[in-house]
Amino acid sequence: MPQGEVSFFEVLTTAPFSHELSKKHIAQTQYAAFWISMAYVVVIFGLKAVMTNRKPFDLTGPLNLWNAGLAIFSTLGSLATTFGLLHEFFSRGFFESYIHIGDFYNGLSGMFTWLFVLSKVAEFGDTLFIILRKKPLMFLHWYHHVLTMNYAFMSFEANLGFNTWITWMNFSVHSIMYGYYMLRSFGVKVPAWIAKNITTMQILQFVITHFILFHVGYLAVTGQSVDSTPGYYWFCLLMEISYVVLFGNFYYQSYIKGGGKKFNAEKKTEKKIE
């Protein structure tokens, strides 16, 4: 490793956790992460073409491990960032918890925030399971993966106050989502309404982020101190708007249009299994 570079294990094993080291590590890897995301797009569509005339792979075992691993990681991350955010609430106040970074990026919540950024590359693996098992690949899926990963890497070293809430909400929703996927992959019968509510939670986190961003934006234009930058602020706002539109459309197509065809089909499947 070239002199001056910070390794993953150096950040992981430094006690107490050093946010400055983690920022250096992400800064060193963000360009590689960007090119990985570009390669990801090429690979998934190339692989999709290759799989056109092939039978789907039976990946039950690997999928079980994958979903269980991400469910455990997301749950631990949710717990760590929940305690970190509660500390900010009680020590600095509700609004300050997203206006300024405080101590959130230090300690256990800081370590999991750093791991959160890195995990966005690992989550590309979700798409491989979709393609190799010949499940439908939606634009929403890969677009969301690519944009979230690049935003996470690019904005990490900027110390954005509102990223504390984004990280916490994403961890929390993912802990439930991957827990649901894990149960499904293990063959556990899960009520159809749970999938519907997970989509609702995903949309809700984007809506909450909008309120936070609007407040931070108001404070910024009125000359008050905020931990934000114009470039990353607009990147985040436009990204979140696109997510509300895409996830909202998915919700409409799945659970409202035609009386909720997807939802009703899943319920019928449940009855057949029972």
UniProtKB/Swiss-Prot annotation:
MF (Gene Ontology): fatty acid elongase activity
Cited function: Catalyzes the first and rate-limiting reaction of the four reactions that constitute the long-chain fatty acids elongation cycle. Uses malonyl-CoA to add 2 carbons per cycle to the chain of long-chain fatty acids. Condensing enzyme required for the formation of isoheptadecanoate (C17iso), which plays critical roles in animal development and growth.
Keywords: Fatty acid biosynthesis, Fatty acid metabolism, Lipid biosynthesis, Lipid metabolism, Membrane, Transferase, Transmembrane, Transmembrane helix
Any one cellular-component term (Gene Ontology): endoplasmic reticulum membrane
InterPro entries: ELO_CS, ELO_fam
EC identifiers of the protein: 2.3.1.-
PROSITE patterns: ELO
Main location: membrane
Expression sites (tissue/organ): Expressed in the gut, neurons, pharynx and muscles of the vulva.
Family indicated by similarity: Belongs to the ELO family.
Origin species: Caenorhabditis elegans
GO biological process, one term: fatty acid elongation, saturated fatty acid
Pathway: Lipid metabolism; fatty acid biosynthesis
Cytoplasmic side: 52-69, 133-135, 181-202, 252-274
Catalytic reaction equation(s): isopentadecanoyl-CoA + malonyl-CoA + H(+) = 3-oxoisoheptadecanoyl-CoA + CO2 + CoA
TM helices/strands, residue ranges: 31-51, 70-90, 112-132, 136-156, 160-180, 203-223, 231-251
The encoding gene: elo-6
Segments on the Extracellular face: 1-30, 91-111, 157-159, 224-230
Protein name listed in UniProt: Long chain fatty acid elongase 6
